[in-house]
Amino acid sequence: MDVRPLAQGLEFPEGPVALADGSVLLVQIAAGAIARISPDGTKTTVARPGGGPNGAAIGPHGKCYVCNNGGFEWHAEGVHRRPIGQARDYAVGGIERIDLETGNVECLDRVAGEVPLKGPNDLVFDVEGGFYFTDLGKVRARDMDRGAVHYAKADGCFITEVAFPMVTPNGIGLSPDEKPLYVAETEAARLWAFDIIEPGVVRKEPWPSPHGGRLVAGVGGYQRFDSLALDAEGRICVATLINGGITVISPDGRHVEHHPMPDPITTNICFGGPELKTAFITLSWTGRLVAVDWPVPGLRLNYAR
C-alpha cells in the first residue's frame, strides 16, 4: 500500500475523524489537545481539554465527543515517545463534549453508577443517538484495572455498564446493521462481538466467555490490538501494535489479513474522502497522520460531517 504522509510532528496522535471538508480531526494525547489537520497538512488546535484525550467521534448537533483517559506517563526515546502507565497527576477519566467552533469543553460523565470511569478509550455512536464506549482502565507499576464497555446518552443523562470484566478493552465499532458490537482487547489481541438486543443491552454468552462476548478472532505472536473501524462490507479493521499495521478481520473471524504500516505503534484508522475509500491512519510512535487508498469503502458513521 502507498502510504502518503499528511502531517508530522504530532504529539502521539489518535482518534482520527474524517470531516466533509477533507480535513481530519484528531487528538494529541501527549499534548492534551484536539487538532484539525487540513488537506495541505496545516495543523490547527481546536481545543485543549487536558488529561489524555483518546478516542473521538462526531455526535448529535455536530459536537465532538471525546474519551479522556485522564493522562499517561511517557517514555521518550529521541523524538519518539510512548505511554508507560498512569500519569502521576491522574485524577479520573471521563467523557467530554467539545464545541468545534468555540473549543468549549463540557464534562458529561465521570462515573457509571457508583463506579468511577478510569480510562475511557474509544467510542461509537448508534443510530439512536447514544454511544458505546470502552473503559480500558489504567495501568500502574504493579497492577492494572479490569476494563468495561458502557452505553451512554449524548445529553449525559444516562449511562449503563454493558460488559465487564474485560482485559484492556480498546477499539469499538458497530456492524453495518448495528447488531453486533465489536470490541478489541489490547493486551490479549482478541476481537469480541456482542449481539445487541436493544440500545445498551447485549445478549450474554454463557461461561467460559469471561464477560458474555463471542470471540471473533485472536492473533498469534506478540501483537496488541488498538482502535478499529469497519468497512462497508462489515470487515473489522483493527490498528495493531508491535506488528505495526492494520489487521483486517472478517465478521466470522475466518479471514485475517495484515497490512503493514511504517510504525510499530499504529493506533487508529478512520475512513473519509468522496467515496470513503481513503483510510486515515495515526502512526503514534513517529507522530504522523498518513493516508492510504483502501480497496473497500469504509462504513459511513452516524453523524459523520
Please provide the spans of the model-predicted regions.
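Sequence-structural signature of mature extracellular/luminal beta-sheet repeat domains
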Residues: 1-305
